[in-house]
């Protein structure tokens, strides 16, 4: 497993917190219903967040079309974590273009990360993250980025433990 070293890079070592029956694999079109279920659960769980609380009534139908397109896209992957064959987590990773005037020109962008409550603190996030980082490295990407809700202290601590650091804040101003 990968852990942040003191220099901010990732180092490999075993992680005894991972459940023995936990596996991570790239989702396929056959997994679309599970992907929809997990990713909508993420949005519903954060219904107090100013961005995520605005879930559209037709979100499941929109999700089906959107996530199917994402599953077919060669520049991204959706990973599923399964414990004894039951889906317990999801993570999407995209090979994303960087800013045109800055390095790196491409980076991995991690999003839509969700672990079912009963599977939390059992290494699911770390296993999903490890798969995403391996996928990024296979594509020559040397940096990973993500956004997460500022008020989610548990997620902030988890991402910090995986080597991420805050470099900017997303601000929202309602115009109506």
Where are these regions (language model features)?
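Conserved beta-strand in the GNAT
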Residues: 80, 86-95, 109, 114
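Conserved acetyl-CoA pyrophosphate-binding loop and the N-cap/start of the following alpha-helix
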Residues: 119, 123-131
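Conserved GNAT acetyl-CoA-binding A-motif
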Residues: 136-147
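Conserved N-terminal entry element of GNAT/NAT acetyltransferase domains
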Residues: 1-30
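Conserved beta-strand-loop-alpha-helix junction that forms the acyl-donor binding cleft
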Residues: 145-155, 172-176
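Conserved active-site alpha-helix within GNAT-family acetyltransferase domains
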Residues: 126, 138, 150-168
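A short beta-loop-alpha structural element at the N-terminal edge
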Residues: 23-37, 46-48
């Amino acid at each position: 497993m990968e852990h942040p070293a003191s220099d901010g890079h990732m180092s490999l070592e075993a992680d005894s917190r991972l459940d023995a029956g936990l596996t991570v694999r790239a989702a396929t079109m056959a997994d679309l219903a599970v992907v929809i279920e997990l990713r909508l659960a993420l949005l519903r769980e954060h219904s107090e967040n100013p961005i995520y609380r605005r879930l559209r009534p037709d979100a499941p139908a929109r999700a089906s079309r959107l996530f199917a397109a994402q599953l077919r896209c060669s520049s991204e992957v959706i990973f599923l974590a399964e414990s004894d064959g039951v889906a317990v987590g999801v993570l999407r990773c995209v090979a994303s273009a960087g800013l045109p005037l800055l390095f790196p020109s491409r980076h991995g962008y991690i999003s839509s990360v969700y672990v079912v409550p009963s599977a939390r603190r059992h290494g699911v996030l770390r296993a999903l993250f490890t798969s995403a980082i391996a996928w990024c490295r296979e594509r020559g990407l040397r940096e990973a980025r993500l956004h997460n809700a500022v008020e989610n202290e548990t997620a902030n601590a988890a991402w910090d433990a995986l080597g991420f650091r805050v470099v900017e804040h997303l601000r929202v101003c309602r115009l109506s």
